[in-house]
Design a protein with these regions (language model features):
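Membrane-interface helix-loop-helix junctions at boundaries between adjacent transmembrane segments
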Residues: 18-19, 24-95
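Long hydrophobic alpha-helical segments that form multi-pass transmembrane helix bundles
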Residues: 62-144
């Protein structure tokens, strides 16, 4: 009886902690002026459809916070995106502070390319967080502090972090070389991609989520590379969506079981070959 009671208490505590983390990450990924009823609907969808329906804590194959964010993006695109991307209807009531009344760096890049970004912001502005954006994505310094904590406590895998960064650098460099006369996003270098939009925030706090990511060491490298390549492809080639980290991570979530299966089968074949020798 005591054993069952302890197990039940542990399950309740784990479930509550998981829901708390998902709720915080969801809130940080939203625009600051999102209506509270939309925020409640989004996180409810993420927790119920993206997590509990598959068995709860430890059994979800999609990131719950991003699932809720994606639901809002497709259900209410006018409120959650637009010309100003993360900053929407609050401007109708003249409540936006002057320093945050412009389009985001990615929105500027989609319209004017590197010339537009450098005219509006400096790289240091983007690094320090002095640019428009969602609640949690703007300050790279704060995100790096979070990354250090996650790596030291071994909650996050450095393989996913490095794999995503390598994939992003590789894909953005290829597109820089290819170039485009009609799409200014082709010219954005990797070091700008790293500090604008939700790349850093998504990489540190969403992509490294252990449940929905790959579980094998080799698979984590591949999982990260898939995210890095996909986010650049979405940002650069899809003119309707200048961001891309959310969809890139969800796409990689779907591929994670396949990646792990391929890695495990490859390891089995190698061991069989060694055994037969």
């Amino acid at each position: 009886h005591l054993s069952l009671r302890r197990q039940r208490q542990m399950c309740i505590r784990d479930s509550n902690e998981g829901a708390f983390v998902s709720t915080i990450l969801f809130s940080l990924s939203c625009p600051p002026d999102i209506p509270l009823w939309q925020a409640a609907m989004g996180i409810s969808f993420g927790l119920v459809i993206g997590k509990e329906i598959f068995g709860g804590t430890g059994k979800n194959f999609l990131n719950p916070a991003l699932t809720g964010r994606a639901f809002l993006y497709f259900a209410y695109p006018a409120q959650i995106s637009g010309d100003k991307v993360w900053i929407a209807g609050i401007s109708d009531y003249n409540l936006i502070p002057e320093g945050y009344s412009g389009a985001t760096a990615l929105g500027v890049a989609a319209e004017s390319g590197m010339a537009g970004i450098t005219n509006a912001y400096t790289w240091m502005d983007a690094f320090l967080g002095n640019i428009p954006g969602s609640v949690g994505e703007t300050s790279i310094i704060a995100i790096l502090i979070g990354l250090a904590v996650l790596l030291i406590t071994k909650v996050a895998s450095y393989r996913i972090v490095l794999g995503t960064f390598v994939g992003m650098i590789l894909m953005s460099s290829i597109l820089n070389i290819v170039g485009s006369e009609t799409n200014p996003m082709f010219a954005i270098p990797w070091y700008w991609h790293a500090v604008i939009g939700s790349f850093a925030f998504g990489l540190v706090f969403m992509a490294t989520e252990p449940v929905s990511g790959s579980g094998t060491n080799t698979g984590r490298w591949l999982y990260g590379i898939v995210i890095g390549v996909t986010v650049i492809l979405i940002r650069v080639i899809n003119p309707a969506f200048p961001e891309g980290m959310m969809l890139a991570i969800l796409f990689a979530n779907l591929l994670a079981p396949v990646i792990d299966h391929m890695v495990i089968m490859s390891n089995i074949k190698k061991r069989k070959a060694l055994y037969n020798e």
